[in-house]
Amino acid sequence: MKNVPTIHPGVVLRKQFLTPMGISRSALARAADMSPVHVNNIVLGRRDVTVDTDARLAAALGTDQCFWLELQAEFDLESEKGVRDNF
């Protein structure tokens, strides 16, 4: 089985949305009614996406609701699998 790197939703947010769309983290924070620190921590992979965060990002970026939660769930499952595989 091939090892695929686990990607945090913050990486997707930065590489597929913010950078190509020319949106700053602070502009996203304003549009999503979130603190700039919260957005920055998601982008840096320091904070996970919650139901509330998913709804705010979906509204601000025009993504489907649950898009960000699904990315988070996939990240969590792959991260957990990696931990278990090390035993």
Which stretches of residues belong to each language-model region?
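A short, Lys/Arg-rich alpha-helix, primarily the initiator
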Residues: M1-I23, F67-E70
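The alpha-helix within a helix-turn-helix
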Residues: L18, A29, A58
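Short alpha-helical DNA-recognition segment
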Residues: G22-N41
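The DNA-recognition helices of helix-turn-helix-type DNA-binding domains
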Residues: S35, R46, Q72-F75
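DNA major-groove recognition helix of helix-turn-helix
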Residues: V43, T53, Q72
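Short, basic-rich loop-to-helix N-cap that marks the start of a DNA-contacting helix
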Residues: R46-A59
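Short, charged recognition helix plus adjacent turn
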Residues: F67-F87
